[in-house]
Regions:
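Generic cytosolic/nucleocytoplasmic N-terminal low-complexity/intrinsically disordered segments
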Residues: 20-22, 26, 63, 163, ...
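Short helix-capping and inter-helix turn/linker motifs at the boundaries of alpha-helical repeat units
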Residues: 30, 58, 98-101
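Short, well-structured segments within or immediately adjacent to enzyme catalytic domains
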Residues: 70-298
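N-terminal leader/signal peptides at the extreme start of proteins
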Residues: 1-39
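Intrinsic disorder/low-complexity segments
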Residues: 7, 34, 54, 143-146, ...
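Amphipathic alpha-helical segments typified by the pilin-like N-terminal helix
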Residues: 34-74
Length: 298
């Protein structure tokens, strides 16, 4: 026994320290136990981090979608204001349908009214165009912007919103005038709009404009929306779940029409306000002069 391992008792006897009872193998076991406990602690910490990540990441994703939705609303407010300023300058007449000449359409007419800021036409969810397409006119999708070609190389437009075609002050395309049975639905200026807070001017869409009709069903493909030329721009151009907590890239390509439509879009109305509208609610707006709000047709 080493001298420093012993102590004197009260009666002068020698007391042995506790270390005398621990042989080398016992010490190794004790050290191993301490190491094992440390590993268990580390595994518990890792598990807790995983649980916290599972709770926090969806919240962060939701917050990001919400931020994009707010920016979209701000964009549409600026577009709506630009449209109102144009009408004020042209004695209450809405934007003309201009695809001849330089093909400015509404984008070229309004550019000066929103400070020539091109990005105001782009919803943050859909800013990129389809670069794989070689067409001069490229359709958008739930998460991509459309592209409109002009004869002026400096005036190629892109955007994520459509203009309500029933508001155009003159409707003549390369094939001629709008058919008479449809022309009766046109708003003939500011004085003919009886429900300004429920009459859309702009909305999230896969194309530059639209002419919804009461009998229009939603698009079966909620990612690409409904296509169609001329004045045949159905409401399906707008039935894309771009907002409302929905991830636009995951929009169904083949939707069961018996189910409620998912998601929502932003709508700018004639009175200047912008609202988030569920897709199923789109038939409750006054898209044209003779519209009767009702349930969604299938």
């Amino acid at each position: 026994m080493r001298p420093h391992d012993a102590q004197l008792g009260s009666g002068g006897g020698i007391l042995f320290s506790q270390t005398d009872n621990l042989n080398p193998s016992t010490k190794r076991l004790s050290d191993h136990a301490r190491r094992a406990f440390t590993l268990v602690e580390m595994l518990i910490v890792i598990a807790i981090i995983g649980i916290l990540a599972a709770l926090i990441l969806p919240a962060l994703s939701s917050a990001k979608l919400k931020a994009k939705q707010i920016q979209c609303v701000n964009n549409l407010k600026q577009m709506d204001l630009a449209s109102m300023m144009y009408m004020h300058d042209f004695q209450g007449k809405c934007l003309p349908y201009d695809i001849t000449g330089k093909g400015l359409l509404w984008m070229g007419k309004l550019i000066d009214y929103h400070g020539e800021v091109q990005t105001v036409r782009l919803c943050p969810v859909a800013t990129e165009i389809d670069e794989t397409s070689t067409n001069e006119f490229r359709w958008g999708t739930a998460d991509r912007a459309w592209s409109w070609h002009s004869t002026d190389p400096q005036k190629d437009w892109s955007g994520s919103y459509c203009f309500n075609g029933w508001l155009y002050s003159n409707l003549t395309n390369r094939s001629g005038n709008m058919p008479e049975e449809d022309a009766v639905n046109l708003f003939m200026g500011e004085s003919t709009i009886e429900h300004p807070s429920e009459t859309p001017v702009f909305g999230d869409s896969v194309w530059v404009d639209c002419w919804p009709k009461m009998e229009d069903p939603p698009a079966a493909d909620l990612y690409h929306g409904t296509h169609g030329g001329g004045f045949n721009g159905k409401i399906g151009r707008l039935t894309i779940p771009r907002h409302g907590g929905f991830i636009a890239a995951k929009a169904p390509r083949s939707f069961d029409m018996d189910q409620p439509l998912p998601g929502a879009i932003s709508i700018a109305c004639f009175d200047g306000h912008v609202e988030l509208s569920k897709l199923d609610n789109l038939w409750n707006f006054y898209w044209h002069r003779n519209w009767v709000p009702g349930a969604r047709p299938n």
